[in-house]
């Protein structure tokens, strides 16, 4: 297992973080750290989540996050980012 860092841009709406954390809970993915804040565009928030897993876990997390309505962009942050 390795450390995976996922960065996303989401709608600046109530309950977006709740839906994201609920997806992690339903899939039994454990969030190690989470940070959220307003992006340059005030209608968008930036959320960064770290977790531990393999490539399959990473792929599943990204696919599930991309299905959420208020999630605009999802990507893995690599060490060189």
Located regions from the model:
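A conserved regulatory-domain signal marking ACT and ACT-like small-molecule sensing domains
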Residues: 1-81
């Amino acid at each position: 297992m390795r450390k995976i860092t996922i960065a996303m841009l989401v709608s600046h709406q109530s309950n977006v973080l709740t839906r994201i954390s609920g997806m992690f809970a339903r899939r039994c993915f454990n969030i190690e750290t989470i940070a959220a804040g307003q992006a340059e565009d005030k209608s968008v928030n930036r959320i960064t989540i770290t977790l531990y897993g393999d490539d399959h876990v990473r792929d599943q997390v990204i696919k599930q996050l991309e299905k959420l309505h208020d999630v605009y962009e999802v990507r893995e942050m690599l060490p060189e980012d």
